[in-house]
A protein has these predicted regions:
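Active-site-proximal cap/loop segments of hydrolase catalytic domains
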Residues: 5-200
Length: 200
C-alpha cells in the first residue's frame, strides 16, 4: 500500500483568513476535489502508483468524507472504508462544529403594520447528507459503526445503509457491538483486519 494524507484548503489559520475559512458553507466537496487532484498529481509524477486502484478510509469526520468520496468519484475510487461517519449532519450533536459549517443565513426585509422595515433571519443546514449521493455510488464501500457510539450516533451509518439498500446498491457493513466512537481491543483488531482485507 501507498498511504498519503492531504492537507486541504482551509486546513490551517497560518496561511491567512481567506485560506482558513475557505470551506465555510461547504465542508465536503472541496476537500474531495483536493484529494483527487493530489493523487492524480502523485501518480503522474511516480510511475509505481497504480491510479486504477485507489482507496480511501476515514473515521468520524473522515468516515463522512470517505463515503462521500466513493459516491462523488465512483470511477476514481475502487474501495472505501468509512467508520463512525457523521453521514447526516442534520442529526449530529449540536456541540460539534461540523453541524455549523454548512449553516445558511437568510435575511429577509419585511414591513410591519406601520410600514417600518425590519430584517428577519432564518437559518438552515445546507450540507447535504451522504444519503443524497448514493445514486452515484457503484461499488467498494465498507461501513463500520460502534453500537454504543455516544459521539456519532449509529443512526448516521444506518441512514446511509438504508439509502444504499433502497437504491439497490452493493456494500458491506459491520456494527461493532461493544464499541463506542473509538474502536479498542478485539474490536479494533477486527476492524483493522477487515479494513486491510477490503483494500487488498
Amino acid at each position: 500500500f501507498i498511504v498519503i494524507t492531504v492537507g486541504h484548503r482551509g486546513g490551517t489559520p497560518m496561511r491567512g483568513k481567506a485560506y482558513h475559512t475557505y470551506g465555510y458553507g461547504n465542508q465536503r466537496d472541496y476537500p474531495l476535489a483536493d484529494d483527487k487532484y493530489a493523487i492524480e498529481q502523485l501518480a503522474q509524477r511516480y510511475s509505481f502508483i497504480d491510479i486504477k486502484r485507489v482507496g480511501i478510509y476515514g473515521h468520524s469526520g473522515g468516515g463522512f468524507m470517505s463515503a462521500s468520496a466513493i459516491c462523488t468519484y465512483p470511477d476514481f475510487y475502487s474501495a472505501a472504508v468509512s467508520s463512525a461517519g457523521n453521514h447526516d449532519n442534520r442529526i449530529y450533536n449540536k456541540g460539534w462544529v461540523e453541524i455549523h459549517f454548512g449553516v445558511d443565513e437568510r435575511i429577509k426585509t419585511v414591513k410591519d403594520s406601520l410600514g417600518v422595515e425590519h430584517k428577519t433571519y432564518t437559518y438552515s443546514v445546507r450540507t447535504r447528507p451522504n444519503q443524497d449521493l448514493v445514486k452515484n455510488y457503484k461499488h467498494g464501500l465498507l461501513l463500520f459503526t460502534g453500537a454504543m457510539d455516544q459521539t456519532v450516533n449509529p443512526a448516521h451509518t444506518l441512514r446511509l445503509a438504508s439509502a444504499l439498500i433502497k437504491a439497490k446498491k452493493d456494500f458491506g457493513m459491520y456494527v461493532l457491538p461493544e464499541s463506542t466512537h473509538g474502536f479498542f481491543g478485539k474490536s479494533e483488531e477486527f476492524f483493522e483486519h477487515e479494513m486491510w482485507r477490503h483494500f487488498s
